[in-house]
């Protein structure tokens, strides 16, 4: 069964980001290794071999984490010969940022009277 990415390319920031999609993104980002991968890719597209060396991870372990991030919609990849290059999907990060900003803005709203 194909995995639906959390973020649909080209959608306005948080309009397409519902609770399920936000949960998928936050879950993908909750792992310390995946955060290291995201930070490493903040400088631009990288080959898997570069990431394994920089992060000190076995290729199989890194591949698992890259798959989780890609399926969440946070990464894109391309193959060039026998190498696979990964890059961040800025749209996903912007949508998550927008969703968090809306959530933060709603925190300041006063409570409605009850009873």
Model-derived regions, located:
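Short acidic/polar alpha-helix capping motifs at helix-coil junctions
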Residues: 11-15, 47-48, 62
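Alpha-helical residues within the helix-turn-helix
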Residues: 53, 64, 70-71
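Short, structured secondary-structure boundary patches
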Residues: 25, 72, 82-84, 98-102
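Amphipathic alpha-helical dimerization/coiled-coil segments
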Residues: 1-21, 90-115
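N-terminal helix-turn-helix DNA-binding core of bacterial DNA-binding proteins
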Residues: 20-60, 80-93
């Amino acid at each position: 069964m194909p995995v639906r990415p959390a973020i649909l390319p080209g959608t306005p920031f948080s309009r397409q980001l519902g609770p399920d999609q936000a949960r998928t993104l936050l879950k993908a980002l909750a792992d310390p290794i995946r955060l290291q991968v995201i930070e490493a890719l903040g400088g631009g597209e990288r080959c898997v071999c570069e990431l394994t060396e920089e992060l000190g991870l076995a290729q199989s372990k890194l591949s698992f984490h890259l798959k989780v991030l890609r399926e969440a919609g946070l990464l894109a990849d391309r193959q060039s010969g026998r190498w696979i290059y990964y890059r961040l999907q800025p749209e996903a990060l912007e949508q998550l940022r927008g969703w968090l900003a809306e959530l933060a803005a709603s925190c300041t709203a006063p409570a409605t009277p009850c009873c």
